[in-house]
């Protein structure tokens, strides 16, 4: 599974419960990836609200909750992620400093290895798309005897 998250320069994802930014060119980029893989992208109703009617509904699954069995999940809110099911992470870097009160953080035991970096020129500025391969480590806590 691939998780997609948009972040600002400080790892911020939300401010006052709302997305920091949105971009038409990035949405097209995402839908093109999913279409090329003959797949679908899962997202919350909140995330789906930024997609227009003509933006290929057949490629999207709108869900309140995720099973993490989906091929792609576009997340805009900090939710618990089953990292052991994640193979790839796509970070859309806004390359801007925005106000934020929720941040994207990797938990201990999750390692991301950068595979590819792309630049997308949007209507207002250039976005950096970073694709990572995700590895999880099993951490075992030994009980005191």
Regions found by a protein language model. Name each.
Residues 1-145:
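Enzymes that bind and transform nitrogen-containing heteroaromatic metabolites
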């Amino acid at each position: 599974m691939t998780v997609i998250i948009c972040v600002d320069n400080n790892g911020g994802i939300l401010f006052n419960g709302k997305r920091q930014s949105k971009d038409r060119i990035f949405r097209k980029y995402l839908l093109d990836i999913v279409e090329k893989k003959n797949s679908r992208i899962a997202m919350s109703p909140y995330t789906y609200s930024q997609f227009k009617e003509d933006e290929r509904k057949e490629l999207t699954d709108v869900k309140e909750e995720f099973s993490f069995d989906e091929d792609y999940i576009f997340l805009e809110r900090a939710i618990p992620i089953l990292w052991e099911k994640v193979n790839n992470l796509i970070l859309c870097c806004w390359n801007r400093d925005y106000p934020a009160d929720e941040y994207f953080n990797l938990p201990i035991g999750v390692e991301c290895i950068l595979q590819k970096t792309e630049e997308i020129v949007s209507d207002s500025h250039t976005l950096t798309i970073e694709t990572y391969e995700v590895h999880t480590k099993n951490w075992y806590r030994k009980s005191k005897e």
